[in-house]
Amino acid sequence: MSGGKYVDSEGHLYTVPIREQGNIYKPNNKTMADEMNEKQVYDAHTKEIDLVNRDPKHLNDDVVKIDFEDVIAEPEGTHSFDGIWKASFTTFTVTKYWFYRLLSAVFGIPMALIWGIYFAIVSFLHIWVVVPYIKSFLIEIQCISRVYSIYIHTFCDPLFEAFGKVFSNIRINTQKEI
């Protein structure tokens, strides 16, 4: 750890005790974090959410962005009355807007809870089951791969090398008869 040095009563040179340098696990001293070239970590659970741009990663640009013109269209030559068209547009837009709000008010929190639990389980399984299983499999497969490699080099390589030498002398001539 970085820090100053001090001399004790007997004249021995020591570094500053770790406890005086700040928390050894998570430095809360900004100068210490700067000295150690650590970047500041922000908690993902306390960040502010953007109430204007609610899809900053554009997950739903091509899927759910449905307007009146995307669903209902009258081709040239088959037009309804202008008043009907305007009323249909307003009805579609307002109904979609308020029904979405109603559904999100009723089911939004329970669905967020369900998806939160689901992704917590998936994350837990990935961290505590999948990755350790893959690592242990890779460790175990190394032993098998060494035995397999010895088997291949001992038995199969000479066999296929012999086959190669036998079949290397075969010549095929093709002639076209008229």
Curated annotation (Swiss-Prot):
N-acetylserine: modified positions: 2
Pfam families according to UniProt: Caveolin (PF01146)
Residues with Phosphotyrosine modification: 6, 14, 25
Annotated localization: Golgi apparatus membrane; Cell membrane; Membrane, Caveola; Membrane raft
GO MF terms, alphabetically ordered: ATPase binding; identical protein binding; inward rectifier potassium channel inhibitor activity; nitric-oxide synthase binding; oxysterol binding; peptidase activator activity; protein heterodimerization activity; protein kinase binding
Residues annotated with Phosphoserine modification: 2, 9
Membrane topology designation: Peripheral membrane protein
Region annotation (Interacts with SPRY1, SPRY2, SPRY3 and SPRY4) ranges: 131-142, 167-178
Keywords: Acetylation, Cell membrane, Golgi apparatus, Isopeptide bond, Lipoprotein, Membrane, Palmitate, Phosphoprotein, Ubl conjugation
Location of N6-acetyllysine modifications: 5
Record topology, Cytoplasmic segments: 2-104, 126-178
Required for homooligomerization as annotated region, ranges: 2-94
Region of interest: Interacts with SPRY1, SPRY2, and SPRY4: 149-160
Record carries keyword Phosphoprotein: yes
Main location: Golgi
Stretch list, region Interaction with CAVIN3: 82-94
Intramembrane-annotated stretches: 105-125
Membrane-traversing stretches: none
Entry PTM: Phosphorylated at Tyr-14 by ABL1 in response to oxidative stress.
GO biological process terms, semicolon-separated: angiogenesis; angiotensin-activated signaling pathway; apoptotic signaling pathway; basement membrane organization; calcium ion transport; canonical Wnt signaling pathway; caveola assembly; caveolin-mediated endocytosis
One of the record's GO cellular component terms: perinuclear region of cytoplasm
Similarity section: Belongs to the caveolin family.
Function: May act as a scaffolding protein within caveolar membranes. Forms a stable heterooligomeric complex with CAV2 that targets to lipid rafts and drives caveolae formation. Mediates the recruitment of CAVIN proteins (CAVIN1/2/3/4) to the caveolae. Interacts directly with G-protein alpha subunits and can functionally regulate their activity. Involved in the costimulatory signal essential for T-cell receptor (TCR)-mediated T-cell activation. Its binding to DPP4 induces T-cell proliferation and NF-kappa-B activation in a T-cell receptor/CD3-dependent manner.
Annotated protein name in UniProt: Caveolin-1
